[in-house]
Swiss-Prot record:
Keywords: Cytoplasm, DNA-binding, Transcription, Transcription regulation. One of its GO terms (cellular component) is cytosol. GO terms for biological process: regulation of DNA-templated transcription. The lineage of its organism: Bacteria, Pseudomonadati, Campylobacterota, Epsilonproteobacteria, Campylobacterales. Pfam families: TACO1_YebC_N, Transcrip_reg. It comes from Helicobacter pylori (strain HPAG1). It is found in: Cytoplasm. Its main location: cytoplasm. This is Probable transcriptional regulatory protein HPAG1_0159.
């Protein structure tokens, strides 16, 4: 994948290690999930997943409980909005936001793009077709081994639940399926009693591009600004 990819991955991991930034994003996901489907994780799969992802980032239980309670307060008045943009070198950007003030959010995003020559926000729907939406689950390889399952066994067991692709990455196993199969795949993990490390819906570029180190470094400046915004909970690009 090249040095540019490694640079991008290392930079992203470093940013997401800033707990002061990641916790507010995780809390918003929990609050919105509780608002949409109720505050009981046992009956709200979306909330279960949001809590799971928060625990994976070592978010304290008190923070999780506070985020759930916030769903019934004025602070819980959040909405999900997606924005799209283009940058230099053919880079396409999709930004998923959770906000209580869409006017503030779009104004901030426009300011980041305006500070980057050649970058701009584009009308929603302009880039949607350039990305596939997928359900993505992560689990630990040793958890699969603890269940006396091979990777082939796991793949066979989850096919009926919507699995499309299984990939081994280090000590983790990545499971991908159709966007609409998220709930079904979640049920598949539960039926196997296989702990989920992380889960979510992701956008995967249909035609990824590669940038050289210089191009990546310039692009990172814009991506940093976007990801540092508390209203942005997910950022997707077509960078390989």
């Amino acid at each position: 994948m090249g040095r540019a990819f490694e640079y991008r991955r290392a930079a992203k991991e470093k940013r997401w290690d800033k707990m002061s930034k990641v916790f507010p994003k995780l809390a918003k996901a929990i609050t919105l999930a509780a608002k949409d489907g109720g505050s009981e994780p046992d009956t709200n799969a979306k909330l279960r997943t949001a809590i799971l992802n928060a625990k994976a980032q070592n978010m304290p239980k008190d923070n999780i409980d506070a985020a759930i309670k916030r769903a019934s307060s004025k602070e819980g008045n959040l909405s999900e909005i997606t924005y799209e943009g283009k940058a230099n070198f053919g880079v396409l950007i999709i930004m998923e936001c959770m906000t209580d003030n869409p006017t503030r959010t779009i104004a901030n995003l426009k300011s980041y793009f305006n500070k980057t020559q050649g970058a701009s926000i584009v009308p929603n729907g302009s880039l949607e077709f350039m990305f596939n939406r997928k359900s993505v689950f992560e689990c630990l390889k040793n958890e699969v081994e603890n269940l006396k399952l091979s990777l082939e066994d796991l793949e066979f067991a989850l096919i009926d639940y919507g699995l499309e692709e299984l990939e081994e990455v280090g000590d983790k196993i990545i499971i991908r399926g159709d966007y609409n199969s998220f709930k079904l795949l979640n049920e598949g993990f539960e039926s196997l009693k296989l702990p989920i490390l992380k889960a979510g819906l992701q956008r995967i570029a249909t035609t990824p591009i590669e940038l050289n180190d210089e191009q990546m470094e310039l692009t990172e400046k814009l991506l940093d600004r976007i990801e540092d915004d508390d209203d942005v909970v997910a950022l997707y690009t077509n960078i390989e």
